[in-house]
């Protein structure tokens, strides 16, 4: 059964990344003509007491939303695309994105995100690095068996990809994980820049070419018909050498050539020229798809990705919210919406198969599961992305929304109503709560709704009005939590200026048995965390602690995020360096009491860590050194 609880509000048809066109008639032969949405958007414009300009939206059954151009996703063939303007979206949130510090995901969370990515319509899901650990292998395999075999009514099913270094053990492990998907892919890589050859691999150019050629051929020999090859650090590699090694892996059977700007050093003009040069000078390039993978070290990942697509790349590698190692990766939402807004006008008619109205919900899921908060001014999905505070901008928006809005919030699935609709409060019932959650895009099962309803009533008793932001915080705290090894039942805090703070905490274990502990600390949170530690008995170090108010006012709900590292050295293998890295675990909590939300966050992080420990208790990995010669 599908465990994801997110859906885009009132959606049924895919968005194919192009500006709105006149409505199709009912007699249109477009395969999407029967999927028009029968709803109408109503906009309420108001000024808050802080002088901030807000736009609220609601939906009512009436006339259709603006339709989408009748461009179809081409049938999937690994090494070619029938429509020269179609750009494949390769999402690596579950692999490169998870390498962000503190972004450790459980197997269930990875599966939820993969299902949501399929709803979004990504062409390829890089589900992980199977050789990193047994847990990673099982997560990729599960995604291949489930998401990789779920075909929608239009025949769409995502490619499920596993990453591997250029050695037989990694490649065999990747194939064993992804082979259960209808469309499996192996993505193998080896460095090609002089600095990597000299200091990391300690190999000659000829040796690396031989390894790359043999390993691509080996991947094909396993029965995998879809093999992607990446020359790591291509942005700093010698051009003639790139043309040579890429030509050799094409002859060996590669179907996609991914060109990574691994350290994010190139400028858009440079990266676009790199793609153009590879397209013009690589033997056999017409028989493969060119891909981009741009890191964000100089803040240019989105620009470089678009430049690469404009120069001929027809696959782009991205992550939700741009998460990833160091400064992150090219952001899916930015790249996709740039192509949608400017594809026809500037990029020669490029388009994607992404249903953009699932963007906000996918972004929220990744944010909650990873614990990595999206900055307010983040393009497309940031809290301020559609806020207007300047008086001049407000005046323009009141006169015509197009003066300062290049896309509508509805295009990305953003819902902001309630200002002109039903106000939720202490007298609201379960049905009203469920309806509003559905409008916001959240579908909860009966158990989740029941638990949330009583938390909603508790908040409503203390607040005159429960806002959408409050609801989203409560939903996130209820359903975006790891499987409970420990559950917070009750707690009591005594604090003040006369002495040490004291805390009594009651937790329930997975069998329902209650445990109570008391402790003192330098503050209420410190005392509570020490009491939790006395019960759980799993040593951990608190690395980060942050808190923010979801809404304004003294009665605001607070969300807390913590990042911990287990003292028992939970580790996995870094896909790029091959080194063993210590895993960190994040947790989030929400509540009107900041100490309670803090303890919920800490218990959530501990549950993640304990869940990882359980999954890897029989770990049987043997990491290969990055300079090992494949057999």
Swiss-Prot record:
Residues 87-360 form the Pyruvate carboxyltransferase domain. It is an enzyme of class 2 (transferase). One of its GO terms (biological process) is L-leucine biosynthetic process. Its cofactor is Mg(2+); Mn(2+). A divalent metal cation binds at residues 96, 293, 329. Its EC number is 2.3.3.13. It catalyses: 3-methyl-2-oxobutanoate + acetyl-CoA + H2O = (2S)-2-isopropylmalate + CoA + H(+). Disruption phenotype: Plants do not show any changes in soluble amino acid content. PROSITE patterns: AIPM_HOMOCIT_SYNTH_1, PYR_CT. GO terms for molecular function: 2-isopropylmalate synthase activity; lyase activity; metal ion binding. InterPro entries: 2-IPM_HCS-like (IPR050073), 2-isopropylmalate_synth_dimer (IPR013709), AIPM/Hcit_synth_CS (IPR002034), Aldolase_TIM (IPR013785), LeuA/HCS_post-cat (IPR054691), LeuA_allosteric_dom_sf (IPR036230), LeuA_bact_synth (IPR005671), PYR_CT (IPR000891). Catalyzes the condensation of the acetyl group of acetyl-CoA with 3-methyl-2-oxobutanoate (2-oxoisovalerate) to form 3-carboxy-3-hydroxy-4-methylpentanoate (2-isopropylmalate). Involved in Leu biosynthesis, but does not participate in the chain elongation of glucosinolates. Homotetramer. This is 2-isopropylmalate synthase 2, chloroplastic. It comes from Arabidopsis thaliana (Mouse-ear cress). The gene is IPMS2.
């Amino acid at each position: 059964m599908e465990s994801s609880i997110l859906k885009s509000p009132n959606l049924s048809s895919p968005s194919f990344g192009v500006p709105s066109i006149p409505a199709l008639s009912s007699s249109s032969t477009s395969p999407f003509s029967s999927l028009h949405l029968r709803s109408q958007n109503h906009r309420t414009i108001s000024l808050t007491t802080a002088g901030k300009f807000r736009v609220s939206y609601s939906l009512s059954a009436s006339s259709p939303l603006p339709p989408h151009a009748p461009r179809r996703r081409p049938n999937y063939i690994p090494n070619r695309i029938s429509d020269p303007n179609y750009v494949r979206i390769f999402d690596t949130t579950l692999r490169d994105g998870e390498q962000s510090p503190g972004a450790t995901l459980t197997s269930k969370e990875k599966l939820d995100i993969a299902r949501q990515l399929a709803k979004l319509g990504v062409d390829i899901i890089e589900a992980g690095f199977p050789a990193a650990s047994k847990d990673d292998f099982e997560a990729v395999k599960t995604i291949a068996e489930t998401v990789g075999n779920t075909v929608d009514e239009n025949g769409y099913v995502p490619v499920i990809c596993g990453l591997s270094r250029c050695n037989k053990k990694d490649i065999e492990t990747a194939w064993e994980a992804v082979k259960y998907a209808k469309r499996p892919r192996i993505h193998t890589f080896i460095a090609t820049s002089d600095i990597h050859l000299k200091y990391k691999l300690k190999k000659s150019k000829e040796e690396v070419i031989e390894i790359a050629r043999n390993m691509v051929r080996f991947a094909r020999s396993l029965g995998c018909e879809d093999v992607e090859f990446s020359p790591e650090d291509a942005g700093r590699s010698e051009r003639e050498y790139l043309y040579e090694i890429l030509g050799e892996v094409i002859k060996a059977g590669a179907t996609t050539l991914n060109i990574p700007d691994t350290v994010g050093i190139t400028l858009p003009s440079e990266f676009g020229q790199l793609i153009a040069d590879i397209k013009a000078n690589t033997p056999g390039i017409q028989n493969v798809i060119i891909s981009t993978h741009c890191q964000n070290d100089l803040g240019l990942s989105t620009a470089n990705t678009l430049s690469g697509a404009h120069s001929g790349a027809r696959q782009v590698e991205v992550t939700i919210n741009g998460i990833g190692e160091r400064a992150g990766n090219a952001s899916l939402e930015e790249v996709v919406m740039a192509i949608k807004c400017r594809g026809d006008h500037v990029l020669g008619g490029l388009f994607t198969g992404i249903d953009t109205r699932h963007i906000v919900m996918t972004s929220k899921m990744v944010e909650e599961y990873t614990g990595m908060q999206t900055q307010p001014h983040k393009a497309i999905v940031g809290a301020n992305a559609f806020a207007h505070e300047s008086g001049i901008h407000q005046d323009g928006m009141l006169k015509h929304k197009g003066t300062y809005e290049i896309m509508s919030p509805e295009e990305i699935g953003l819902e902001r109503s309630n200002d002109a609709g039903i106000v939720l409060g202490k007298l609201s019932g379960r049905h009203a709560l469920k309806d509003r959650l559905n409008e916001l895009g959240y579908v909860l099962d009966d158990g989740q709704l029941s638990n949330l309803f009583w938390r909603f009533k508790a908040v409503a008793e203390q607040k005159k009005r429960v806002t959408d932001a409050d609801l989203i915080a409560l939903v996130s705290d209820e359903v975006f939590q790891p499987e409970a090894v420990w559950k917070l039942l009750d707690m009591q805090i005594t604090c003040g200026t006369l002495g040490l703070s004291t805390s009594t905490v009651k937790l329930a274990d997975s069998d329902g048995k209650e445990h109570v502990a008391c402790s003192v600390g330098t503050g209420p949170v410190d005392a509570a965390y020490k009491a939790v530690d006395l019960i759980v008995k799993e040593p951990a170090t608190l690395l980060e602690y942050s808190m923010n108010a979801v809404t304004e006012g003294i009665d605001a709900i607070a969300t807390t995020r913590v990042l911990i590292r287990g003292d028992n050295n939970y580790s996995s293998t870094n896909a790029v360096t091959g080194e063993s890295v210590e895993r960190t675990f994040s947790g989030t909590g929400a509540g009107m009491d900041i100490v309670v939300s803090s303890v919920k966050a800490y218990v959530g992080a501990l549950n993640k860590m304990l869940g990882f420990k359980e999954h890897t208790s029989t770990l049987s990995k043997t990491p290969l050194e990055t300079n090992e010669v494949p057999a």
